[in-house]
Amino acid sequence: MKRLFLTMGLLMFGALAGLAQTKLTLEQALEIALSENPTIKIADQEIEIKRYAKQGTYSSLYPKIDASATYQRVIEKQTMSMDFGGQTQTIKVGSDNSFNGGLTAAMPVVNAQLWASLKVSALDVELAVEKARSSRQDMVEQVTKAYYTVLLAKESLGVYKRVYDNAVENNKNVKKRYEVGSVSEFDYISSNVSVQNAEPNVFEAENSVVLTLWQLKALLGMDLQMDIDVEGSLSDFKSAMDEAYNLSQLDLTDNTTMKQFDLQEKMLDKALKITKLANVPTVSINAAYLYTALGNDGKFGDRKAWNPYSYAGVQLNIPIFAGNAKRAATRQARLNLSNLQLQRENIERQLRVAMIQSLNSMQTSVKQFNSADATVTQAKRGYDISVKRYEVGRGTLVEIDNSQLALTQAELSRNSAIYNFLTSKIALDKILGNLEY
């Protein structure tokens, strides 16, 4: 948390002081994203919601106490007729005003369904925690990949700038020699064209850097107008390519998707038991302490008008018949559990395929890097030789252009190999559930 405050303070100071750029490390970017991104905040709040829901379920175990009061004004009293020796007499029955009030209490003693639902509530909280963990891992993966993408864009910009600088330098040399008549006009025009051809790649690479930085800032929840940059280069992370990965040692034990399926399966299994427990008798106790008062004058001040009464009892409820509702609910719960198990099997198969694909991509990227790295060394040497040959009049601009193209392709391939390895590795770590931060 202290590091997060320092990072945010650095960003604010950079904005207020008008600094050209504020540079972020990968660790700082992850800290900002995990604290500022709305997706993470929503996931954390969902945990609190489930915890409150769990508390609400547990409250069903405690006595329920209510206070009530009722006042009634009789508009037309009931009439009772009686026969006395052949004569019928009618009598008005009741009082003009009546009042009832007091306390009632009830508490479950034996309720198997309620007890089972408490376990479901606890599992629901665990599921919310696991979903929050999944959201954090998703964010770590997205931010890390976005960070690597910025580094790749900057590396590509560096390559194209070197190509442009080399073209400008060669053009200067050709121009000097053209002015003294030692090279043809064709060579001079060709060198000018090489400079002009190199410029669009630089502009496009610069635009790619800006766009990738915007994407990173969006993930971090930052103002898109804030001027930031990232620290380091792709080569700083290439040491990860030396790590050995064995498919037989990889498993899905910590995979967040599989953990969510496990929790959901437990919840559905509990739900099935709850539907079966609907046929189990329940026992509850209840009690009340009430007052009642009757009067025709609307006054209840006389203590004699108030009559208290109370009771306590035990209620036994035995389910006997409710149509086919309980049987249908049980069958529905069984089907839901079966469907989830089939989905789990399918997702597990897909995750294992993705795990193998990521591992193969990493291994291929290592081979591509080794090949491209060796090619860069040779291509640099070839370019230097072609320039020297042209300077002494034994080479041509075509040789320089060809060697420059070979060097450019080799450097881009090397950078792409590192980038592909890193993105495949972060995807594999996500599948394995190793992106804890």
Give the role of each language-model region.
Residues L19-D66, T70, E76, L224, ...:
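Bacterial Sec-pathway N-terminal export signals of envelope proteins
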Residues K41-Q45, Y58-S59, V109-R136, K161, ...:
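Sec/SRP-type N-terminal targeting helices
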Residues L6, D66, L224, S413-Y437:
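Acidic, low-complexity, intrinsically disordered peripheral segments
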Residues Y178-S182, Y390-R394, I431:
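A short glycine-centered flexible hinge/capping loop motif at secondary-structure junctions
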Residues R3, D138-L252, S361, S365:
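Periplasmic alpha-helical coiled-coil/stalk elements that build and connect Gram-negative outer-membrane
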